[in-house]
Each structure stands twice: as C-alpha cells, then as structure tokens.
Amino acid sequence: MTWIESISRAKAAGRLKTLYEKYQRLNGTIANIYSAHSLRPHTLEGHTALYRAVLGHTGNVLALWYLEAVGLYVSILNQCTYCIDHHNHAGGLAYAGKPEAWSAIADALMGDRLEAVFGGKELALLGYVRALTLDPAALTAESIETLRE
C-alpha cells in the first residue's frame, strides 16, 4: 500500500514490536496502515485511538455496519483500492451472520445505486458524504440543515 519506508513485523523491535503484537489480527498479521506508521509508533497509537473512537464508541447512534458502509462509499469515491478492501471486509464483519445482506449493500455502493438498499436518513447522509468527498466547497449551511430534518 505505502511508498514510504516502513518496518515489517519481522524486523520490528522495542515499542513498535509491542504495538504490532497488541494490534495484530487473529491470524497474526497486521494491517498495512500500521506498517505505514512504523517509523513513528506513537502515531500508530493515535491512529488506533481515533479509529476506535469514531467507529467503536458506545455513544455512536449509527450502526457499525452503516459507518463501515460510509467508509466504503468514501473509499469508492476516492478510488482507493486498499481502503475499499478494508471497509468491505470490515463491513462484512459488522454485518455478521448476514453475508448476502452486506454483499447487496457493497454492490449497491460500488455501482452507485444507493437507492437499491438505502432510503430516508441513510440515503440522505450518503448524499452528503458524496458531496463532502467530491466537492466540499459546494456545501452550505443548508446542506447540514437538510440532514437535521
């Protein structure tokens, strides 16, 4: 994923090795984004804290699967293959037990056919996400007020 210098798990030592062990996946691998932080391990901790606060906070009112759907949509709009793979996988995990339902959501997002699976507030928020990602300067206070209704 990254073109910057990074330290592999096999070559990690000290604090970085400890963090890699702490944040490893069940299969013993680490996410590529962690490798991108390897030269400055404190940023890896900050990244993880922010990610968990945004997606895993108990105060969230939006379901985790929907937050991952938003992440997937932004990734699609930005044409970031790595991020698409990450959020598609994470969304599937968040929608555990219903792989066909997540597959339909992911397919609709990838085909920009949002109305096929979303409606109401979910669809409105995805419209805002699209505008914020592709043309943030075009957003106005009215854009936000519409979402609050």
Language model: regions and residue ranges:
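Hydrophobic alpha-helical segments
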Residues: M1-E149
